[in-house]
Amino acid sequence: MGWLRIERLEPDFAGWADILALIHRAFAYMDGRIDPPSSAHRLTLDGLKAKAGKEIAFAAYDDDRLVGCAFVELRDGHAYLGKLAVDPAAENGGIGRLLVEAAESQTRRVGLPALELQTRVELTDNQRTFQRFGFREIARTAHPGFDRPTSVTMRKDLA
């Protein structure tokens, strides 16, 4: 691994197709493991650009190679971390942690006291990783049409 850096992306960023491909690669391992399937599969280039226009996007680079991304949505009382994705070929290199730290810094910068995220009930490894990053479970919710919890909401207090 080379030199890792995190960049904040602007809506006019030229590499949205690369970000979309990264998200699809990073979320592919969930196929057949989670129900309902990840919304990442429904994300289109236009949808991603629209998301970037409303949220704060970050990209992680290993030298000049795109290896991760994350989106931060500013909400009432907290920020929401979504579409955190790390290239499968670059996993376990600290990229996810750097992206979470960038999201935390942005959340603090705008004066919000907490960062929340959701992961799936079946993805217990992800839950443990986020716990190591200081997040705690605050709720379990069900997707429409499900009578059981499908998502775990986690929160990290930053104040």
Q: Locations of the language-model features?
A:
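C-terminal "cap" of GNAT-fold acetyltransferases
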Residues: 3, 49, 113-159
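Conserved GNAT-fold acetyl-CoA-binding loop/helix
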Residues: 11, 21-48
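A short helix-loop-beta-strand connector motif used in the catalytic cores of GNAT acetyltransferases and
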Residues: 47-59, 80
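Conserved beta-strand in the GNAT
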Residues: 59, 65-73, 78-85
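Active-site acidic-Proline motif in GNAT/NAT acetyltransferases
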Residues: 74, 87-93, 121-122
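Conserved acetyl-CoA-binding loop-helix of GNAT-fold acetyltransferases
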Residues: 86, 92-105, 132
